[in-house]
Amino acid sequence: MCGIIGINSNKPVSVSIINSLKKLEYRGYDSAGIATLSSGQINEVKSEGRVDKLEKNSMVQNMEGKIGIGHVRWATHGLPNSINAHPHSSQNVSVVHNGIIENSTLLKKFLVGKGHKFKSQTDTEVIVHLITEHLKTDDIINSIKKTLKSLHGSFALGIIFKDQPDLIVGARRGSPLAVGYGPNENYLGSDSYALKSMTNKITYLNDGEFCVIKKDHVEFFNEDGIKINKKVLELSSDEENYNKGDYKHFMAKEIEEQPITLKNGIKEYVDSANKDINIYNFPWKENEITSITLIGCGTAYHSCLMAKYWFEELTSLDVSVDIASEFRYRKNRFKKETLYVFVSQSGETADTYAALDLCKKNGMKTCAVVNVIESSIARDSEFVLPIHCGTEIGVASTKAFLGQILILYILSLKLGLLRKDMKKELFNQKLKDLKELPKLVEQTLLIDNKIQPISNTFNEAKGSMFLGRGFSYPIALEGALKLKELSYIHAEGYPAGEMKHGPLALIEEGMPVVVLAPRDNYYKKTISNMQEVIARGAKVLLITNKSKDEIVSENIWETLEVESTNEDLLPFLLTIPLQKLAYYSALKKGFDIDKPRNLAKSVTVE
């Protein structure tokens, strides 16, 4: 969600801050702002809308400050306008903030009683006035320490001071924050992506820590204000992921490169020579795990639902799936034999991180499936399984979804073999099929010409449904989510067998319904459910896999056939036309495909 940047340099920083804010646009935002310090004054410019609008402001172009902070805001408290945009400033302090201050109402009441006047509707402004109040009697370190201890909720902060022209303060709790190092300048940012264009040397702050950034060095402190030492990490470059190349949108590029990312993932984990799966340094023996709980949000939750079928099919483990935002609010009965798997593309999803934190506090086994190996969820889990997809820029996840289900499938195969739930011959055959998957995905991607005209019908409809059974059900949910995210068309995914229990009442003449009916064990039953919606006037888009057998059904509006493979792998192929359907629907509507309204790539608030 919100993204922050800070730069302390020996040259003017406004251009670099604007460029870094552009790197943070993928996180999702509705307003932007910048503040620099020069000639003993804090100069602040904010605007509703895109960073481009901010960049064109003549005040920004004339900024000369060599120290500054910037922000892209996703509204949580207060309307998305220039008043509520960050930075928020008093006469002496300016703050950018990612997170939510849960006790802001009480703090504001206290501060108003002290004579402070507020300009905005945001929770962030209380931080500005708290620091200002403490600075009346304390130095910067103690003022920051006292302020942070007063705040309930989550935050990543960047702070500059009128009377301290040589430093930026950064602090975090719950929301990610990184420090970068450059020649004669240092940086602060919400993630490594915003900093990579300037440096590959980075330090991540842990919860409760804060830092003081000067041009030539950085000091780190724990929550008690005691100096601590932190490691500097050197990041590898993946610059090709930040360039659209010949594609109109990052999402189009990310859909098309899925054969490559799947091939990379298979290469990382599958030992073809020895017909085995390598999951190095797995910290538990197979008999120490009797159940698995898979936890995620949004698309990652759908990945977990997909994996549940595989774990149940290929192992004798008990499997449960939880939405991360609900997990903490139930009375969980933690068992030491349960492996908790946390799935998050960014590795910074606030609700997923909070669920991980709860499991850690209860001494549970924790494993992360992430795309960003330097992320908070990865760093705080006992074991990490990276999905090796490269940076994903489009807000609507595509290649990361296939990457997540690939790694979860690989884990289910490995545990099935180790636990002797699967014979080696079957394991070998499934590995052989898996190695062919990238080629099958590549062939399925050629479906464009059929998908483009189909998308017109979805754009003209009031809503749509996506139906699936068994392995196909989580893919139906994911397809509906993609259409909602990108085209702003109401779409719902349902188990095909549930139609008669309510959803059938919504079917009307001409309503588009996607039916996922691969030729698996559930095929005939799903076709029967399809006939029920056709009988009520629905326009059915049937997505199945190629077969010599004829489809025994009448009045199907359109049929798309993906390549054939074993049942385990068909969900990968069924996903492709759904991604393209959402993409082309949004394209024809002229919407911002890479940055859909109201959404964020990295959901760092609960």
What do the PLM-derived regions correspond to, one by one?
Residues 287-436, 516-560, 581, 589:
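Glycine-rich phosphate-binding loops that contact phosphosugars or nucleotide phosphates
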Residues 49, 66-83, 271-284, 307-343, ...:
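Glycine-rich oxoanion-binding loops at beta->alpha junctions
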Residues 258-262, 266-293, 383-512, 586-606:
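Active-site phosphate/pyrophosphate-binding segments
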Residues 1-244, 248, 260-267, 271-288, ...:
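Conserved short alpha-helical segments that host acidic/polar catalytic motifs at enzyme active sites
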Residues 24-33, 98-102, 170-179, 247-251, ...:
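Conserved phosphate/anionic-ligand binding catalytic regions in large, soluble enzymes, centered on
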Residues 225, 565-606:
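Generic C-terminus detector
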Residues 154-185, 454, 459-485, 520, ...:
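Acidic/histidine-rich
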